Amino acid sequence: DRSRSKKVEMLARVFDHCSMKYRSGFRMLTLGWSDGNSFLPVSHSLLSAAEDKNLICGGKQYDGRSLAGRRRLQSRRKATEVMVELIHSAQCAGITAKYILFDSWFSAPKTILELKKQERLDTIAMMKKSKTKYGYQGERLNVKEIYSRNKKRRGRSRYLLSVLVEIEKDGESLPAKLVFVRNKSKRKDWLVLVSTDISISEEEIIRIYGKRWDIEVFFKACKSYLKLVKEYRGISYDAMSAHVAIVFARYMMLSVAQRENEDDKTICEL
């Protein structure tokens, strides 16, 4: 958040989903790795505005082949595109994972298909209750229509409904499992998870997706205790990116220390 700034390099108008207002600043897209015991930030990108109308201040001109040039070009791309780029870079660096977890903001069919086809990674994510249609029993239905047509599980089951669908986009398709669960904050409402690994159980899908909460804890720690927002107030885009990397390094040291002090049996796994 740089609401009072005017000359910050690559500064843009970004939508704050908490206050439901536009603010001046950046969106920090973060890729992290977790084994269920520890969370480590892997990479990030400070996203500016994809559209010129939302760009407040431009950036310095660099050769597009240089790191500074590539970083600025990346900041102007869509978050879904940058997410795939960060995952590809992490895999090229030797950082592997079994599943990619993300919320409904990134769960478009195109993104899920791209991760499976290009990166060979299965996805477990929250889905939007949008008009996006999926192949189900020979028909094209959205999640609301699928939910309304099926009988729900009763009692204290961890999920309400589980169905197999086909995620389709641009002539390509991918089998997936949709798991409908109760919304704890609104008992009459429901949420839907998707997994492209249809071999695992519904309980396992719910358990694995719960690990995504680690990144929310990470954001809270960085903002509240590691001075992510207020320590650096300069105008250089490169310096801001470096500051974020320093904050991430601080969190990594804390994460390793916590692992060694609290869970001796997992030291050799890190």
For every predicted segment, state its role:
Residues L228-L270:
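Basic, amphipathic alpha-helical segments enriched in Lys/Arg and hydrophobic/aromatic residues
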Residues D1, E202-R233:
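Short amphipathic alpha-helical "interface-anchor" segments enriched in bulky aromatics
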Residues D1-S3, L31, I100-F106, T123, ...:
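Short, conserved catalytic/metal-binding motifs centered on acidic residues
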Residues D1-A50:
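Active-site-proximal, Lys/Arg-enriched surface segment
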Residues H44, A50-L67:
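Short acidic, low-complexity segments enriched in Ser/Thr/Gly/Pro
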